[in-house]
Amino acid sequence: LINRQILSKPIFESYFTEEDYGDSLGLESWERIQYLDNLPEGIASQMAESAARNKLIVETYKEKQDEYGQTIVFAVNVIHAIQISALFNKAGIKSDFIVSDIRDGVTGVTVSREDNERKLEAYRNGELQVLVNVNILTEGVDLPKTKTVFLARPTVSSILMTQMVGRALRGTAAGGTSSAYIV
């Protein structure tokens, strides 16, 4: 499929922080994470609010912006999506976020299906360089010009991982790109 340009050639990149998440969790907690594919709220919050981790994501994109092209970031939770998108915009990178319909008492942000559709259209039209999302762009959305995905949320689900990676793998014969970055 790659040779026929139906799929993009994947280029995998990994970046690391010195942060550890879940060191204090016992075996039962780790088994629960694997079974439910859901992080405990404390770990999700720690990841979402990590200034060093979020800065690394934005700086990595900024350094390779020409190579990465249009990018989807898979965030840990709503707060993470809002923070990452704000950091991208502060760095001069046009970004927005999409999440499920919410009215968040903590952040005061209301997002509707119409808001998400408007943001998706802006991304499709090239008005946004980065689209940050929480559990929305894993399936059923056609964004063929996506060249890079940042997997900023963990998963143990091979199905979810395949769906996230697949957002960038549409090849030129299918209206996409010749190569795709999985970060």
Please give the residue ranges for each predicted region.
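Conserved RecA-like P-loop NTPase helicase motor core
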Residues: K94-V183
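Interdomain helical connector at the RecA1-RecA2 junction of SF1/SF2 helicase-like NTPases
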Residues: L1-G69
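Short acidic, gly/pro-rich beta-turn/loop elements at beta-sheet edges
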Residues: G22, Q83, I159
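Compositionally biased, intrinsically disordered low-complexity regions
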Residues: S24, E28, T71, T107-T110, ...
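Conserved C-terminal RecA-like helicase domain
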Residues: P40-N133
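Intrinsic disorder/low-structure terminal segments
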Residues: I11-Y15, L87, G140
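Intrinsically disordered, low-complexity boundary segments flanking structured domains
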Residues: L1-R4, I82-S85, R167-A173
